[in-house]
UniProtKB/Swiss-Prot annotation:
Record key words, sorted: Disulfide bond, Secreted, Signal, Toxin
First and last residue of the signal peptide: 1-20
Expression (tissue specificity): Expressed by the venom gland.
CDD domains referenced in this protein's UniProt entry, alphabetically: Spider_toxin
Top-level division of the source organism's lineage: Eukaryota
Positions of the pro-segment in this chain: 21-26
Name used for this protein in its record: U10-lycotoxin-Ls1c
Length: 77
């Protein structure tokens, strides 16, 4: 009986470790997704770029998105 309980606990621990590894591997934010709350979690070779948003001269937010490195966006007039 003790062997069955011990085996169950060991299997539970192994499954928990595997799930934790999978979750830690999925934490990066992909290209063009919002990164306002976690600016340092964009995937490899991607930066979190933020810009100030104004409506009628009043700042209404600071949205951030994961964008490609060394890419510059310009405003189209």
């Amino acid at each position: 009986m003790k062997l069955i309980i011990l085996t169950g606990l060991v299997l539970f621990a192994i499954v928990s470790l595997i799930e934790a590894e999978e979750e830690s591997g999925r934490v990066c934010i992909p290209l063009n997704e919002e990164c306002s709350k976690s600016p340092d979690k964009c995937c490899d070779n991607i930066n979190c770029d933020c810009y100030l948003r104004f409506e009628k001269g009043v700042q209404t937010g600071r949205p951030c998105f994961c964008t490609e490195k060394d890419v510059i966006f310009e405003r189209d007039e």
